[in-house]
């Protein structure tokens, strides 16, 4: 155990967060996301909610300030989003500083970004469209 680091952050996730450089992207996905077929390394965080992990990592993780650092998947035409999901994520991310805007992109554009991500953290999140991409910034 390390002081001030949440026990929700596994050693594997801590290593990945430290190895990421500015501009690298990481996805925190819901339990339904096809993470293992995307290509990047997959970290399992079964049983944890995305919002809890976001709250745990945000004290350690600088979001990009030059490009939109937060991306979520848009609903497929004819489907609906639960606004509570984004609200939970915004609340978790705003504990250290104001939360930047979250942009939405279509499912296939999100999959393309996922294939290029540094890592994908697959969680126990069951919320539909519960995936979020974070772009790492330069640590001050």
From Swiss-Prot:
Keywords: Carbohydrate metabolism, Cytoplasm, Fucose metabolism, Isomerase
Active-site residue list: 22, 64, 111
Catalytic reaction equation(s): alpha-L-fucose = beta-L-fucose; beta-D-ribopyranose = beta-D-ribofuranose
Residues engaged in binding substrate: 30, 73, 111, 129-131
Pathway(s) per entry: Carbohydrate metabolism; L-fucose metabolism
EC main group: isomerase
Pfam families on file: RbsD_FucU (PF05025)
One Gene Ontology CC term in the entry: cytoplasm
Annotated consequence of substituting residue 111 to F: Reduces binding affinity toward L-fucose. Significantly reduced ribose pyranase activity
UniProt-recorded Gene Ontology molecular function terms: D-ribose pyranase activity; fucose binding; identical protein binding; L-fucose mutarotase activity; racemase and epimerase activity, acting on carbohydrates and derivatives
Compartments where located: Cytoplasm
Protein family membership: Belongs to the RbsD / FucU family. FucU mutarotase subfamily.
Job description of the protein: Involved in the anomeric conversion of L-fucose. Catalyzes also the interconversion of beta-pyran and beta-furan forms of D-ribose.
Protein name stated in the entry: L-fucose mutarotase
């Amino acid at each position: 155990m390390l002081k001030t680091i949440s026990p929700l952050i596994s050693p594997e996730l801590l290593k990945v967060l430290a190895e990421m450089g500015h501009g690298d992207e990481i996805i925190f996905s819901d339990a339904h996301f096809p993470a293992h077929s995307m290509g990047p390394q997959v970290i399992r965080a079964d049983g944890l909610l995305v919002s809890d992990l976001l709250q745990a990592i945000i004290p350690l993780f600088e979001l990009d300030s030059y490009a939109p650092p937060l991306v979520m998947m848009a609903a497929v035409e004819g489907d609906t989003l639960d606004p509570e999901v984004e609200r939970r994520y915004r609340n978790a991310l705003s504990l250290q500083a104001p939360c930047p805007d979250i942009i939405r992109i279509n499912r296939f554009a999100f999959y393309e970004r996922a294939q290029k991500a540094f890592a994908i953290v697959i969680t126990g999140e069951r919320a539909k469209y519960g995936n979020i991409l974070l772009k790492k910034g330069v640590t001050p």
